[in-house]
Amino acid sequence: MIFLLPSIISVMLLAEPVLMLGDTEDADLMEMVQLSRPFFNPIIRAVELVELREERQRDCGHLHDPCPNDRPGHRTCCIGLQCRYGKCLVRVGR
């Protein structure tokens, strides 16, 4: 069995028609991709969580952004800011 880095595997999968791999090499490559899938699943989930967190950060208002309260359930200002005078301003100490 051939041992390749994941990036090389993806390049080889994309270039498969050009390389014209034989049936055995193709089957070995596909088997290796299937066997490596459980290893990469946690990495894929972690990347998805990071993307979700970045999406949530974009959904909030940054400093001096307007913060309309007409969207119920939507966090209008980012963490550390509060909505005052219709804009997201620095949170005043408690």
Swiss-Prot record:
Q: Name one GO cellular component term.
A: extracellular region
Q: Where in the cell is it found?
A: Secreted
Q: Does the keyword Disulfide bond apply?
A: yes
Expression sites by tissue: Expressed by the venom gland.
**Where does the UniProt annotation place the signal sequence?**
1-22
Q: What is its main location?
A: secreted
Q: Which residues form the propeptide?
A: 23-58
One of the entry's Gene Ontology molecular-function terms is: ion channel regulator activity
Top-level taxon in the UniProt lineage: Eukaryota
Residues modified to Valine amide: V92
Q: What keywords sit in the KW lines? A: Amidation, Disulfide bond, Ion channel impairing toxin, Knottin, Secreted, Signal, Toxin
Report the record's disulfide bonds: C60-C78, C67-C83, C77-C88
Q: Which family does the record assign?
A: Belongs to the neurotoxin 14 (magi-1) family. OAIP-1 subfamily.
Q: What does this protein do?
A: Probable ion channel inhibitor. Shows insecticidal activity. Acts synergistically with the neonicotinoid insecticide imidacloprid. Is neither a repellent that repels insects nor an attractant that is preferentially consumed by insects. Is very stable.
Q: Domain notes, please?
A: The presence of a 'disulfide through disulfide knot' structurally defines this protein as a knottin.
Query: What name has this protein been given in UniProt?
Result: U1-theraphotoxin-Sp1a
